[in-house]
Structures are given as structure tokens and as C-alpha cells.
């Protein structure tokens, strides 16, 4: 094969596996899986904007990313507030000149209680953060995603949206809703060249989970029960989730939409609980 043709093929291949020149908004990017997602996308060439409720944590992260040479900006946002969500998207539109390639609805909360003990406040926090905020952000991001001519929406679901897990009925309901929303938006927005997918992690060893395990023997027992039923025999790492999200955003994944992909070491394939 002629050298020029080989060079052209290599160039095209690199483009399929790169996020260079793209823009991304990642919610809840100051810790855990969100932090890994920000680093993953920025490391692959994307300009990333993120948000957090905690200003101190966010500022520390932004400084670390600057030192690493990553193109990341961010601001404080309480995603339970519709007004603050609107303000966030206005800022993103300004920073990225009205175009957004990637929206990762990562931010989420979980409260552990028996179903009979959940309060109205619990309901508002869980459904407001996990479902309403993600839905609304997708709505107001739609013009920016469409304008990019290559839009991607990624939702963070969970194995709890598929398997019945103990003491998280509201959380499970919010993730089940996310799964159905993924399919609906994927079909509705395909005509606008916007792909919509969900990633559903299993047990992931974030710093918060590791701290909880050390402080609470019951928490460690619950995690161990998950791992016993996981064919790969271990918990996952945040980077193993962020890598899957990056893949779904690559041009190489251009025919994948409407999917809920489990990143759980085989837990759901093995029947869950």
C-alpha cells in the first residue's frame, strides 16, 4: 500500500478514537466517578466544564487539573435548584460558544433506609438530584447538543435500576427512570444526531466508599456480599467506568444509542441478588 494511503488511514483511525476539539459538561466532577470522568475526557482532548456543590473541593480539583495541563473549568452549582441549573447551562453555552458535544449526567445521591422509613424530604432529594436534574439538564442542553452536530448524552445509572437491592428503593426507582429516559431520548433525538446512552456501574471503590468501609463494618459486609456474587471477584475502579463513558463519546461509537451498559464485573449477568 502506498505510504500516503497508509498515513491517511492512520489519521482517520486516530480521529475515531479521539475527543480532540470536543466540548463536555460533567456534573458532580469533584470526586469519585465524576472526577475520573473529567480526567478521562480532558485527557483525550476534550474541553471540559464541571460543577460541584462544594466550592473548596472544586477549587482544589481545578488546581490539580491545571497542574496536569488539562483544559477544565468549573463552577459551584446545587443541582436541586432549577434556577442554578439554568444558570449553569447559560455559563456552559457562553464558555463553549453555544455548542456542546458531550453531556454527562453524573451527579447523584443515595440514602439507605427501609422503604417504610423514607420521608418526603428524602424523596425530593433523591428524585430531584438523580432524575429531575438529569432530565432538565438534558432538556436545556438540547439546543447546544444539536448545534454541535455530534451530540452525546450519557446518564449514570446503576445496577440498582435493574436488580432489587436492600434499603435503596427510592434510589432504585430513580435509576429505573433514568434507564427508560435513556431509551426515549435516544429515539426522539436520533434525528438531530444526538446519541443517548447510560452506563450502569456495580460496586465501585471510590474514596467515599473506601472510607465508609473502614468506618462501618456493616458497610464492608454489604460490599463483600456484592463481590461474592460478582464473577470477576472484585469491586470496580472509577477509571473503569470513565473509560466506558469515553468510548461511548468517541466517533467510533457512532452507531450506539439507547443502550444501558453494565459496568459491574458480571454481577447482573450472574443474576444479581
UniProtKB/Swiss-Prot annotation:
It is an enzyme of class 1 (oxidoreductase). One of its GO terms (molecular function) is tropine dehydrogenase activity. The active site is at 171 (proton acceptor). Keywords: NADP, Oxidoreductase. NADP(+) binds at residues 25-49. This is Tropinone reductase 1. InterPro entries: NAD(P)-bd_dom_sf (IPR036291), Sc_DH/Rdtase_CS (IPR020904), SDR_fam (IPR002347), TR (IPR045000). SUPFAM superfamilies: NAD(P)-binding Rossmann-fold domains. Belongs to the short-chain dehydrogenases/reductases (SDR) family. SDR65C subfamily. Pfam families: adh_short_C2 (PF13561). One of its GO terms (biological process) is tropane alkaloid biosynthetic process. It comes from Datura stramonium. It catalyses: tropine + NADP(+) = tropinone + NADPH + H(+). The keyword NADP applies. Signal peptide: none annotated. Substrate binds at residue 158. The keyword Oxidoreductase applies. Homodimer. Catalyzes the stereospecific reduction of tropinone to tropine. Transmembrane segments: none annotated. Pathway: Alkaloid biosynthesis; tropane alkaloid biosynthesis. It comes from the Eukaryota. Its EC number is 1.1.1.206.
Amino acid at each position: 500500500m502506498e505510504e500516503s494511503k497508509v498515513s491517511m488511514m492512520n489519521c482517520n483511525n486516530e480521529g475515531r478514537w479521539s475527543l480532540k476539539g470536543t466540548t463536555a459538561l460533567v456534573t458532580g466532577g469533584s470526586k469519585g466517578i465524576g472526577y475520573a470522568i473529567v480526567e478521562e475526557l480532558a485527557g483525550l482532548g476534550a474541553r471540559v466544564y464541571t460543577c460541584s456543590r462544594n466550592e473548596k473541593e472544586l477549587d482544589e480539583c481545578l488546581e490539580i487539573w491545571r497542574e496536569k495541563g488539562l483544559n477544565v473549568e468549573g463552577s459551584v452549582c446545587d443541582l436541586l435548584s432549577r434556577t442554578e441549573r439554568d444558570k449553569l447551562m447559560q455559563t456552559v453555552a457562553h464558555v463553549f460558544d453555544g455548542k456542546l458535544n458531550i453531556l454527562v449526567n453524573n451527579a447523584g445521591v443515595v440514602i439507605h433506609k427501609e422503604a417504610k422509613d423514607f420521608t418526603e424530604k428524602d424523596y425530593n432529594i433523591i428524585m430531584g438530584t438523580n432524575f429531575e436534574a438529569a432530565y432538565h439538564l438534558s432538556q436545556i442542553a438540547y439546543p447546544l447538543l444539536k448545534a454541535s452536530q455530534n451530540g452525546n448524552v450519557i446518564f449514570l445509572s446503576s445496577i440498582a435500576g435493574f436488580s432489587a437491592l436492600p434499603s435503596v428503593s427510592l434510589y432504585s426507582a430513580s435509576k429505573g427512570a433514568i434507564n427508560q429516559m435513556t431509551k426515549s431520548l435516544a429515539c426522539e433525538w436520533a434525528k438531530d444526531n444526538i446519541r443517548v446512552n447510560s452506563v450502569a456501574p456495580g460496586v465501585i471503590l471510590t474514596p467515599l466508599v473506601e472510607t465508609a468501609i473502614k468506618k462501618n463494618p456493616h458497610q464492608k459486609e454489604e460490599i463483600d456480599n456484592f463481590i461474592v456474587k460478582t464473577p470477576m471477584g472484585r469491586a470496580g475502579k472509577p477509571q473503569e467506568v470513565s473509560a466506558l463513558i469515553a468510548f461511548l463519546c468517541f466517533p467510533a461509537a457512532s452507531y450506539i444509542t439507547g443502550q444501558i451498559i453494565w459496568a459491574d464485573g458480571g454481577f447482573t449477568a450472574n443474576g444479581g441478588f
